[in-house]
Amino acid sequence: ISDKKLSTIILGPDFPTGGELIYNDSLNEVYQKGRGSIIIRGVIKSEEINLGKGKHKRNALIISELPYQISKAGWIEKLAELVNIGKIDGISDIRDESDRDGMRIMIELKKDSNPEIIISNLYKKTSLQSNFGAIFLALVDGKPVQLTLRKYLNYFLEFREETIKKRTNYFLRIASEKFAILEG
């Protein structure tokens, strides 16, 4: 199987806090060289919210996932600070509406603000988009070695094969001992 085909099967790392990977040549570099940087960004949806009876609808941005190792509370605090000093314009309110069903940060926009411009500013001026350094490092014969994805998978398969052989030999030895006892 070719490296290109391998990269279509293994799409990228899965981070526990979610976020979406920006696929470009950097991920292929990580796969082929064993080291590189991956761009990950938070997930933003735009929706219209109703402010109350008789009031106009407004646009809001809903953030449902943050990049790995970004603190939600710290990110909201930093965003509020940027809005207060005027570095990000067009935001009227920021609310954390997270509950047991998942994360939800609602950013209410001002009446005539453009959601696309604000999304662009959020990615540029906050940690909503960040680079994550990746290195495929493994112990091979007791020494740390930087591996490509193909070598990494080959060593993993060798390890699994060895583990299964050891487990099978153990069960065979136990069964042989029981058989010897029963046979007398």
Regions found by a protein language model. Name each.
Residues 1-184:
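C-terminal interaction appendages of subunits in large macromolecular complexes
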